[in-house]
Amino acid sequence: MGDLNTDLAELRADVASHVPAEIAEVLKADREGFVGVIAEAAAKPGTAMPDLTLPDASGGRVPVADGPAVVVFYRGAWCPYCNLALRTYQREVLPELENLGAKLIAVSPQLPDDSLSTKDLEFTVLSDVGNELGRALGITFRLDPATKPTFDTLIGDVEKINGAEEWELPYPTVLVVDGEGVIRFIDVHPDYTTRTDPADILAAVKAL
């Protein structure tokens, strides 16, 4: 396995070198505001996964508490850090999960559309419109309005992309849910340029 967070750090440096200096400064300040943040309201191991169903890109509905499963929250298809992490999980986690009898599910607040299936992902991608599941798990936050013009410039209107009035996103988070729908592992990353290591995910699944 490679080192996902090393790859993410290299991506962060690459992004900073390819955007105008004023945008790079906003992104740097935005990220630094999350470094060291602890998601104290996040669900704890041993609690039940909310009994919700979410839509996939084809319009079907999938129960998120139907384990054993690894549930990965990401910000959206527009986020390069998310795309790198999801591709890594597909390559390094998904094959092992199939051998262990567990599923891999990715969740973002982005509206279900073709963009959710354009990253060559071979696992289920769900849409948590309005962040209902994310809020229930205590892993959402509202973005700083001062950063909105920068994000609008880079990716477009997040509110439009997500189909919601609130400018709200989930922290990148990985949960492992057992066969009874109970959360056995949760790892929340307020710093959106870091992610859960694939080895830690697999260890949590093997411990079920």
Region spans (language model):
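Chalcogenol-based redox active-site neighborhoods
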Residues: 1-208
